[in-house]
């Protein structure tokens, strides 16, 4: 029986095809709706803003600081084009890797959604890298993505052999469609020779960055891991090795949980945790790097509103990436965030994000110094007391 089509985008990638054809009532597939990309902006990609939302990251201009993170919403060129139509400043594809067919993603369970009082707060995924080969991206998908009008920030895999990483940089670079690279050394559920296993090892990280940087003709940024490492130390190594900018950071290595009726795990391996619940963790890591390492930063983790974007910028980020919010709410969420951000900038009278970048960092101190400050005491307003205690 042929499934009924819904107005969704039918991807060429075989493992997303079934998801793209399913009903949009399933939260996981809402990102594929063409309508959702246009839901807030009518003529997509032509939204007029009152404030100047442009930023310059690593010497490259973005029309605004919002960037589609390397994840499911950038599965292929068409998905990236939709994000561009919704107004996004930059697009990053699923991480591009080997020339040969890449292994299928694990399919022994569903992406696991965590809720609190019925409201989604996070999700665990086991997606790896792009299931399309390097040649497919080079021959077709990057050209489609370029039509987004957004800055092309291309995610590439740090291969086990740094020389292969350098060849990957050259292959993608020769398309002429790359504005920046983002080296993925941080996937939380990779094979033992790639992903976070490189990113948490300073010596391996240094070799990878030096190899990629040696052939890159555009800015070369690195997406770091928040897992099992001193991120300030790793960020320092990355800068010294030649990185032009850093993305802080990839998802949190996690476990979905156990079905107590059967005793079996919901997902039988460790995955990456994303969504609003990780934002305080990433804000800490972003602020620590911003206070200690002088390098352009891109913040990512749990971003879903204009307030989140502003917070990340006030903690030192130049661009701010999002993913899960688009998966849950559609590409129209991009335009909503940008409209709200524009209104906030206009209301506050800011002419540029340069006026607010990093302004919160000066007030961050140690627990010991907090203890020296005058204590605060609660005052009870008896007229508003509900007698709850």
Task: List where the protein language model places each region.
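Glycine/Thr-rich beta-alpha phosphate-binding loop at enzyme active sites
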Residues: 122-123, 188-203, 234-291, 295
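Ferredoxin-like iron-sulfur electron-transfer modules
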Residues: 368-389
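Glycine-rich phosphate-binding active-site loops on the catalytic face of alpha/beta enzymes
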Residues: 93-98, 185-187, 248-254, 302-303, ...
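Glycine-rich beta-to-alpha transition loops that act as phosphate-gripper elements at the mouths
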Residues: 73, 155-159, 224-229, 295-307
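C-terminal helical cap(s) of enzyme catalytic domains, especially alpha/beta-barrels
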Residues: 103-115, 257-271, 327-348
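Catalytic cores of alpha/beta
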Residues: 79-80, 167-171, 229-240, 303-320
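N-terminal capping/small domains of soluble enzymes
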Residues: 46-153, 157-162, 166
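Alpha-helix-loop-beta-strand connector modules within alpha/beta enzyme cores
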Residues: 134-139, 143-148, 200-220, 267-295, ...
């Amino acid at each position: 029986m042929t499934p009924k089509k819904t107005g969704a985008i039918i991807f060429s990638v075989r493992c997303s095809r079934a998801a793209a054809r399913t009903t949009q009532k399933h939260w996981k597939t809402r990102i594929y709706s063409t309508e959702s990309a246009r839901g807030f902006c009518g003529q997509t990609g032509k939204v007029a803003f009152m404030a100047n939302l442009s930023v310059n990251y690593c010497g490259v201009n973005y029309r605004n600081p919002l960037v589609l993170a390397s994840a499911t919403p950038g599965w292929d060129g068409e998905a990236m084009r939709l994000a561009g139509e919704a107004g996004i400043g930059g697009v990053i594809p699923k991480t591009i890797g080997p020339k040969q067919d890449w292994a299928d993603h694990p399919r022994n369970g569903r992406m696991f959604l965590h809720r609190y009082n019925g409201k989604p707060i996070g999700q665990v995924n086991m997606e790896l890298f792009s299931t399309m080969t390097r040649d497919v991206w080079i021959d077709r998908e990057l050209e489609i993505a370029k039509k987004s009008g957004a800055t092309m920030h291309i995610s590439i895999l740090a291969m086990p052999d740094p020389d292969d990483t350098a060849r990957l940089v050259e292959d993608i670079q020769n398309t002429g469609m790359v504005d920046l690279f983002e080296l993925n050394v941080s996937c939380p559920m990779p094979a033992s020779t790639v992903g976070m296993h490189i990113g948490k090892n300073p010596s391996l990280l240094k070799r990878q960055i030096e190899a990629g940087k040696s052939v890159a003709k555009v800015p070369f940024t690195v997406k770091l891991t928040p897992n099992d490492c001193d991120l300030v130390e790793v960020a320092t190594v990355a800068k010294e090795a030649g990185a032009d900018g850093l993305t802080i950071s990839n998802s949190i290595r996690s476990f979905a949980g156990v079905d107590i009726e059967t005793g079996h795990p919901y997902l039988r391996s460790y995955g990456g945790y994303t969504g609003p619940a990780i934002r305080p963790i990433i804000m800490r890591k972003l602020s620590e790097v911003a206070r200690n390492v002088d390098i352009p930063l891109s913040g990512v983790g749990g971003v879903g509103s204009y307030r989140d974007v502003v917070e990340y910028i006030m903690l030192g980020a130049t661009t701010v990436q999002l993913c899960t919010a688009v998966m849950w709410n559609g590409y129209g969420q991009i335009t909503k965030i940008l409209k709200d951000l524009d209104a906030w900038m206009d209301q506050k009278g800011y002419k540029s994000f340069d006026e607010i970048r990093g302004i919160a960092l000066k007030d961050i101190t140690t627990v010991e110094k907090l203890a020296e400050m005058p204590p605060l005491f609660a005052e009870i307003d008896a007229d508003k007391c509900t007698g709850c205690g």
